């Protein structure tokens, strides 16, 4: 999970540095709208919606925006788009596998923007299934350390179905099966442990170690993909050492 964990950390820091708050808000709002449409507008009975709302609140999305997105998705307010989820597969430079998850109201536009971003930044598109087999669908819960140890986290979530806990330096990532996400999240709450986010993701079965040059190329490609309003998430199996991450972030 190290490749994903380090990359997720890097993406978060870069998002703040690059002032992409507007794009981040738009993605979080879309997640809420779609979750409400699929599973209903009551967060108490829709764990996916609950988690989408909590993540938006943690990211300082205004409550009014959150509530309007929930209402649009639930059909309580007009204006919701016909969002479609599409996953594209490809390879970044150095043979790094890439999964691109889009949430779009225009399939042709999404496909075009993904293809352009890939080809202009050294990537190649791949046939469905030729890359996704390198990843497993997992759920990821992140929480800040706040004086907690890995043993504290394990004690809280092990019986709830957690598979592993990753130490990211200033936070922990808890990996579990998607079906165990609610149980793990609830176990943390019962133990009085606050969490930052709980969401579905992809865990690579094999990672590709990168040097500084390779890391720069992969990050440039991912940045280009994330510039598209249709792209929700980009997952790679890149393994970028901490010292190289530090160089890139400077």
From Swiss-Prot:
Localisation per UniProt entry: Cytoplasm
SUPFAM superfamilies (alphabetical): YebC-like (SSF75625)
Any GO BP annotation: regulation of DNA-templated transcription
Xref: Gene3D superfamilies: 1.10.10.200, 3.30.70.980
Alphabetical keyword list: Cytoplasm, DNA-binding, Transcription, Transcription regulation
Molecular function per GO: DNA binding
Keyword Transcription regulation: yes
Any one annotated GO CC term: cytosol
Family: Belongs to the TACO1 family.
Protein name in UniProt: Probable transcriptional regulatory protein MAP_1030
């Amino acid at each position: 999970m190290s490749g994903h964990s380090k990359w997720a950390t890097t993406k978060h820091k870069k998002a703040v540095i690059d002032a992409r708050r507007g794009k981040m808000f738009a993605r979080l709002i879309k997640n809420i709208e779609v979750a409400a449409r699929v599973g209903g507008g009551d967060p108490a009975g829709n764990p996916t919606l609950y988690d989408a709302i909590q993540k938006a609140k943690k990211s300082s999305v205004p409550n009014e925006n959150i509530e309007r997105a929930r209402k649009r998705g639930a059909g309580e307010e007009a204006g919701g788009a016909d969002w479609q989820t599409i996953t594209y597969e490809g390879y970044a430079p150095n043979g790094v596998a890439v999964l691109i998850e889009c949430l779009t109201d225009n399939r042709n536009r999404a496909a075009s923007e993904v293809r352009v971003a890939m080809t202009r930044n050294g990537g190649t598109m791949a046939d469905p299934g030729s890359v996704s087999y390198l990843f497993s669908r997992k759920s990821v819960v992140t929480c800040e350390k706040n004086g907690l140890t890995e043993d504290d986290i394990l004690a809280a979530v092990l019986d709830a179905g957690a598979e592993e806990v990753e130490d990211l330096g200033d936070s922990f990532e808890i990996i579990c099966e998607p079906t165990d996400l609610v149980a793990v999240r609830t176990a943390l709450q019962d133990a009085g442990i606050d969490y930052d986010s709980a969401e579905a993701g992809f865990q690579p079965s094999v990672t590709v170690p990168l040097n500084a040059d390779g890391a720069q190329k992969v990050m440039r490609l991912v940045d280009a993909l994330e510039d598209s309003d249709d792209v929700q998430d980009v997952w790679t199996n890149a393994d970028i050492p901490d010292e190289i991450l530090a160089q890139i972030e400077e």
